Amino acid sequence: MSGAFRLRCRGVDIDAGRPLVMGVVNATPDSFSDGAEMANRPAQFARVDELVAAGADILDIGGQSAITGVPEISVDEEIERITPVVERAVAAGAIVSVDTYRAEVADAALSLGAHIINDISALKDPRMADVLAARDAGYVLMHNPGRPKVRLTETNLYDDVVDAVVEFWTEGLDRLRSAGVADEAVILDFGPDFAKTPHQTLQCLREWERLAGFRRPLLMALSRKDFIGTALRLVPRERDEATLAAMVWIASKVPSVIARTHRPLELRQAFDMLGFLDGRADLHPDDRLDPSLRRQGVTPST
């Protein structure tokens, strides 16, 4: 395991020196992407099982949508939404991330066996860092100068958006260290679409080398995001192929990537193929294609 990209959460070591797949489980009826499909418990459980079978390295479970203009739910309701889903994922042996910005919800999730807290607010809850330290939890530190559920509409927030991300991460890491959270528990996320125009999100991706300088795994939450829809004029459910292209491109460049996706099987296969292309995996000179894999759906003649 590469020491520089060692990720340790709740006593579990995760090899982040290769591209990892984070599959999304929305335990909420109002997700921008698939809320209607995931509004009931059987669908959420089926999604957990699907992600595990598809080879997702991490499952990211959220009980409250980040959509602005939708009222914030209570802490109790958020905990009620995620509890059975977290229990299902933990029982399946998955590494579990919970998407919440509230320390009370984070503590409840970690008590159920979750490993990572994915916080879109970047420690806006003053109790969050102490919860992380007490539970020895992993943490996603996302660049977001705004508050949860509030859309920042200004387009001139930054002289240089990448400079702003770097400064924000530096300050956040200092706060986490002061609370007793080790660097090896931290994942960094530049926050695509959050307080950013589509152009600014694209700029962060193009200047990936500056973001990779922290030598921490980078969460790339690019799946179905606005910058893709803006570039190609597509609604969320039509953005999966373009998402795959963006994910493979960034994974071919950044040394340690965790890709958050709604389509884990395709991304897992793409990352595995990337491993053959960049030399992390290889074929033996005598390897040949199994004849049963040569054609699709052909039945032998009699």
Predicted regions span which residues?
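N-terminal glycine-rich anion-binding loops that anchor highly charged ligand groups
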Residues: 17-24, 50-62
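Phosphate/pyrophosphate-binding loops at sites that engage ATP/ADP/AMP, CoA/4′-phosphopantetheine
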Residues: 53, 94, 170-185
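Active-site-adjacent loop and "lid" segments of alpha/beta metabolic enzymes
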Residues: 2, 7-9, 16, 33-47, ...
